[in-house]
A protein has these predicted regions:
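Conserved glycine-rich cofactor-binding loop
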Residues: 23-24
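Active-site helix of classical SDR
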Residues: 132, 168
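Substrate-binding pocket helix/loop in short-chain dehydrogenase/reductase
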Residues: 108-109, 116-118
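Conserved glycine-rich Rossmann-like NAD(P)H-binding loop of the short-chain dehydrogenase/reductase
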Residues: 37-54
C-alpha cells in the first residue's frame, strides 16, 4: 500500500508535456525524448488510428508507460481544448507545450489556391495560437511553464516556391516574439526553435503539394526548386538533434528566445543580416539554376 502511495506521489511530481503533431518527425522524437527525461507526455495527433511509429519507438526505448496518445486536431479549437482538459484532469498540470504540428505547402504564389493558403495558415499559425491559448490560463495561474514553438529557418529567410510555408513561419516569428513579452511577467517562457533542413515527413508532404503542370509558366523553375529541396531534405542531418534541443530547453530555467539549429542555418542568418538584399537575390537565384 505504501509503495502504491509513494508511486502515486512520484507521478504527481512529474512534469507534464503536451506535444502537438506527435505522429512523426520532430513531434514524435520529442515526445519520446521528453518521456526519457522524466516527463509525462500527452502526445497528440490528428489521427490516433495510426500511432504505431510513436508507440513502437517509445516501447523500444522503454518509456511507453510515460506516454499517452490523444487525438487533437490543431485546426479544431474544441479538439485542442478537450485534449488539454484531459491532461489537466489526469495530471493536474501542464508544464510544457511543444507546438510542433505543421506542414509545408509548396508552389508559386500565382498557382497556389486560396484554399491552400488558408489551410496552411489554419494548421501552422492558427493551430499554434489555439494550442497556446488552451494552456495559457493554467500556466499563468501556476506561475510557470514553457511554450516551445517550432518555427523554421524559412521564417527568417524565404525561398521561391514555398511562399505559403515561409509566410506561415514568418507569422510564427511575430506571434512568438509578442507572446514571449506578454508572458514573461507571469513566469511563462516562450521559446522559438528555427530548424534548417532535416529528413522528416514535412518535406515529402511539401514536395507532393507542388503540382508540375506542363502548361505552367513556372514549370522549369519549380523543377529546379524541387531538385534543390530534395537534395537539402536528404541530408544526413539527424532530427534527433531537434528533439534533444527541445529536452534541453525544457530543463533550462532561463531559456533564451531563439534557437536556430541545423547545418548552415547560422550562416544563412548571418548572410541575410550582413549582405545587401541585391546580393542575396543573386545568390539564391544562382543556387536554383
Amino acid at each position: 500500500m505504501e509503495k502504491k502511495m509513494r508511486a502515486a506521489d512520484e507521478a504527481a511530481d512529474c512534469p507534464v508535456a503536451f506535444v502537438t503533431g506527435a505522429s512523426s518527425g520532430f513531434g514524435m522524437l520529442a515526445s519520446v525524448k521528453l518521456a526519457e527525461q522524466g516527463y509525462r507526455v500527452i502526445a497528440t495527433m490528428r489521427a490516433t488510428s495510426r500511432p504505431e511509429a510513436l508507440t513502437e519507438l517509445a516501447a523500444a526505448r522503454g518509456v511507453e508507460s510515460r506516454l499517452v496518445v490523444r487525438r487533437a486536431d490543431v485546426t479544431d479549437a474544441a479538439s485542442i481544448q478537450a485534449a488539454v482538459a484531459y491532461a489537466l484532469g489526469t495530471y493536474g498540470r501542464i508544464d510544457l507545450l511543444v507546438n510542433n504540428a505543421g506542414y509545408a505547402q509548396g508552389g508559386y504564389v500565382e498557382e497556389v489556391t486560396m484554399e491552400q493558403w488558408r489551410a496552411q495558415f489554419e494548421t501552422n499559425v492558427f493551430g499554434a495560437i489555439a494550442a497556446a491559448k488552451a494552456v495559457l490560463p493554467h500556466m499563468r495561474d501556476q506561475g510557470r511553464g514553457t511554450i516551445i514553438n517550432i518555427g523554421s529557418i524559412s521564417g527568417r529567410i524565404a525561398f521561391p516556391g514555398y511562399a505559403p510555408y515561409a509566410a506561415s513561419k514568418f507569422a510564427i516569428e511575430g506571434f512568438s516574439e509578442s507572446l514571449r513579452l506578454e508572458m514573461k511577467p507571469y513566469g511563462v517562457h516562450v521559446v522559438l526553435i528555427e530548424p534548417g533542413s532535416y529528413p522528416t515527413n514535412i518535406w515529402e508532404k511539401g514536395f507532393a503539394s507542388i503540382a508540375l503542370d506542363d502548361a505552367s509558366p513556372y514549370r522549369n523553375c519549380l523543377e529546379r526548386i524541387l531538385r534543390f529541396s530534395r537534395q537539402s531534405a536528404s541530408s544526413k542531418a539527424d532530427p534527433w538533434e531537434v528533439a534533444n534541443l527541445i529536452a534541453r530547453i525544457a530543463a533550462d530555467k532561463r531559456p533564451r528566445f531563439r534557437y536556430p539549429i541545423g547545418s548552415g542555418t547560422r550562416l544563412l542568418l548571418a548572410a541575410k543580416t550582413l549582405l545587401p538584399w541585391t546580393l542575396i537575390e543573386k545568390l539564391v537565384l544562382r543556387l536554383l539554376r
